[in-house]
Amino acid sequence: MDVVLTLAGNLVPLYALIVLGYIAGKFFNVDRQTLGALGIYIIMPIVTFGYVAQMEFRPSYIALPVVFYAMITCVCFIWLAAGKKVYGDSRANLMAISSASGNTGYFGLPLALMLLPEEWVGVYIFANLGALLFEATILYYLAARGRFSVRESLIKLARFPTIYAVAAGVAYNLSGTGMADVVVTYWEYFKGSYVVIGMMIIGAALAKVKRMVWAPRFISLTFAGKFFMLPLISVGLIMLDQSALHLFDAQVHKIMFILTIVPIGANIAAFAVEMDLKPEKAASTILYSTVFALISIPFSLYLYENFIAITP
């Protein structure tokens, strides 16, 4: 229990930044879209490039985004089928995308910075490409109930600058050219600012929730997919690799686990508003999942480190 409390204590500063973002959005009218644009189009690509350019790249890492994409797609369609039986309306779509979509960027990257050696954060970012691809394809399609074609979804994906930052980082990495000290110094500034801006964006987004909705059955089913089934699939694949495949080492296993234990993605609220997909229920569920993660993440990591992880 002491270990769980210690891990929870380490998360408190991140949640303090969320609270600051909430205050800024609620009382000072800070625009989350402006913060989001700053994070997505300027800070995140620079941070991403730096990490990927400096990581020790291995060909086997190419499989990571594919594996993660397959995992979350599997959960999404299982929960979509279950949602159609329970609800039979658009709530099934919302439950499916909420169960599969995690806040792997704004929340997950600061968490990775806290839990991983710095040289492995680039691998986390590379693996997270699977989440970006899922968002631009399956998530868009289900959120819009078929409104976007595959071509339109891919065009939306092509507009996401992090894709190009990863590609540029891989190319620079393979060139064997090291980053100059002065570049690394300023890149460190961007890395710190991303943690602050990213967590505050979550708070600013939650500040715009006009009415909280408490739907116990919907929340329970969504949480079962997000906080139980998805990590369970991850653990199954990790144990398969540990016992038979031996493709990845312990840090990669931990990265795949971290990707599955973060709260529901904040972008779900934006999709719900745009598509008229019960936006208040979506925003409320995101808030509940973010609060719940303060307990679930330390507990999940404790179980992982003590019963699943193999010390290298």
Q: Predicted segment positions?
A:
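Alpha-helical transmembrane segments of multi-pass small-molecule/ion transporters
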Residues: M1-P312
